[in-house]
Each structure stands twice: as structure tokens, then as C-alpha cells.
Amino acid sequence: METKTNQFKAEIAEMLDLVVNSLYSKKEIFLRELISNASDAIDRAKYLGLTEKELVADNPTWGIEIAVDKSAKTMMITDNGIGMDAADLEKNLGTIASSGTKAFRKALKEKGGEALPELIGQFGVGFYAAFMVADKVRVVTKKRGTSAAFMWESDMSGSCCSCARRDISG
């Protein structure tokens, strides 16, 4: 008897809707999830900066800012954490349930890291809570130690775009 192994297939837009609306009962939760992601990004930068001094050479005042434009119906959450490159965007945002924080913890443990930073994210789905209140989500990011900035955008239709590379200093 011949057997064949197949991969599961999914209707991504419907799966995202199911995940987001099943996990979170209150729309306000999206803000907590996005702030948690920003906090983890800062903690990762601080931790890596202990051994990679060039990552924190600009002596940042770590922080998260939230700006709301009611007339444009937009909210912008800004942090000065570790940032992401194109590969990170694809892996962390373009792959549902892929936790960058979980992968970071695992890599540190494999290197023998004992004093691991207190990071919040674990499951790789909190970011998608933004779709409870937004039709479109855009992430603009630059990984510390690099000059390339990237934009990732999705309307939860199942497709996303990791595009618009731009080289900037700082």
C-alpha cells in the first residue's frame, strides 16, 4: 500500500478571524498585545546590547509611544527596541503562531544563557489582535545594527506584503 504525506491547508483569512475572535473577548485587548510586543522588543535590544555594544551605542532612552489621529482613524505605536529585518517580518508576522520571543528564548537557552530577560510573548498570535479594530495593519521597522527599513502591511485577506525597503542611517 502506497502512502502519501500531505501538508494541512488553510483559508488564512478565515483562520486569522477565528484565532483573533476566539482568543480575545474584548476589543481593547489589542492595545495590551501590541504594547507587550513593543516591550519585548525593547527588552531584547537591552539584553543583546549587553554583549553587542554597537546595538545600544546611541544610548537610547527606551520607550513606547502611542499616537492617535482621530480624524484619520489611525493609531501608531512606536518603540525603539530591537526592530526587524525582512526575514524577521516574514517569519514573525507573515507566519501565524510563530513567536519571535519564543524563538529568541530558545536560542538563548541553547547558547547557555542563564539570566534570561523577562519577555511576555509566547504564542505568536497577540499581534493579530490588531485586526479586531483595524481593517489594515502596517508595520514599519528597522533592525538595530542595520540601515535597511522595511514595511509590512496586511488587510487580513490572507496575503501580506513585506516590501518597501529603504536604507536609512541610525
Language-model regions: role of each:
Residues 1-170:
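GHKL (Bergerat-fold) ATPase N-terminal catalytic module, capturing the glycine-rich phosphate-binding loop
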